[in-house]
């Protein structure tokens, strides 16, 4: 009491509209900061954002738990002679990194040092990282984890349409389509808020078809589930086109007016008769026919693919086969119709548009195109001849670490490559062989286990930045609070390193918005043209769809209504004969193995494994085993099962489930160490996209004792 009055606790609140740090749906959220004796953050779904409309998954609701987590790295660390990481000043850490980079490049050449980026980086960070590698490092070697995610869909769409945007229409079109096929996407778990559009489509009388080796939560919602053998997606897609042709379901007028190359495709699918397709894929002829009739007969229909058909050594061709089908049915470019890809990472779309990929420059330009190089060189104020050529793709880049002529130093931004890569045991060994490994992240993870330097970075709510969601909608993620003392943003780290490498003049920006202004100019005239987009415009319009080539342009929510982006203006059919996965079951390894996600976790788990509520819900990976296979192996629910491939072995807890095929095992890939599913997976690469074959490999299994480890 003072002067007879009670003490009153002062409470201040401030609410910021921003976006989730996880998947490409990029749910709108509001974060309310309440300050009393301490600061608390309350996260809610934004009811006014038109993509998620007030819905959000458990990952989004718990995302603030990451910001003040006790395991967070809050100061730079260097690994000393003892082999342990120790806290150092920023000056010491940055000087060390720059000195090591210069020494390695002096000894081994400019390409000996590279960077690995992320689909979690904002557009500004992706842009500046690409510029940093090519201008400050003068190295060709940059790629990002989107190569593990979107590369096959991107290559397939570019081949057919001349452009790559995950969805060529707004997500709201899903609710309007009369027939929806979800191919290899368990979006009920991987992107739960999108299901409101799927359920709305069903409630309006639309048909839902799901293609997946597992009876997932998504498949349970479907009128028709095609439970195919892993790795046979390409044959099934070709088989559906065969049926469409045989039964007169194709749109010959559309094919003549808007496409080219159909005759080659027609001839290529003549061997894909339904009986043959059933033998190889396991999908009954009746279901094949039902699926193609639903797509063909509906006034509007669309196919949306996920990682299932894409993360294969023939992923690009499989995407082409899906596009071939929808072109032949005359659906692409029509209302609520066509083909689309459900992008995975938060900025998986924007991350590949602005220079993180080994072969690309900002605006979806190509590094080996002389005119494209000249445009970017002018923006960056460098000689086009000084820009390096195309570098190695993600897995090839990592596989070169420590090898003759390969990487000697690597800077990793926002990616846990030791868990996310196929044949991850190989990558872990290669990381340990580097002369310099720098990990820029908010938490230590499996990749930083052998890092020479760990540089702490700001998190999603601690800086402004733009991202591009699965629709091609550019959005503005607003800062909620300042980063903790001792933490820098990725943009600041790149600027400091560039200065120490003698190229600081092109990296001194006062804000992310200033970086975006340069990005706008860099993308002008490109396929992914952001030149008409500004921070102000994004806030006023709930995001803007690219291309947006001028300040007065409203953006482009829908593509292909009048023409495609190839020089002819037509879509291109591509003949894609079926071929087997790189590794099939045999007598030594008689089972298929495939991977996927849990609703509660995200990608390598580097973030979600730090959130108590998510770990309480899903504390460990479990291997799905069909009851018949479990009986044959002699295991029951909760037993330990040792799963082995030619690359490694993992001991999983068993989950008995009739949702999986009896010839297939499934496990999630969110864990590292001895629980890493990617110890088993196959590094065979798609010849076009360089996507690894995560989704298909051969394994064997037997009961495991509690003391058996992994290798």
Task: Name these PLM-found stretches.
Residues 220-228, 456-458, 462, 472-484, ...:
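Short beta-alpha connecting loops at secondary-structure transitions
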Residues 81-86, 249-285, 362-377, 381-386, ...:
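N-terminal leader/propeptide and maturation segments of large enzyme subunits in energy/redox metabolism
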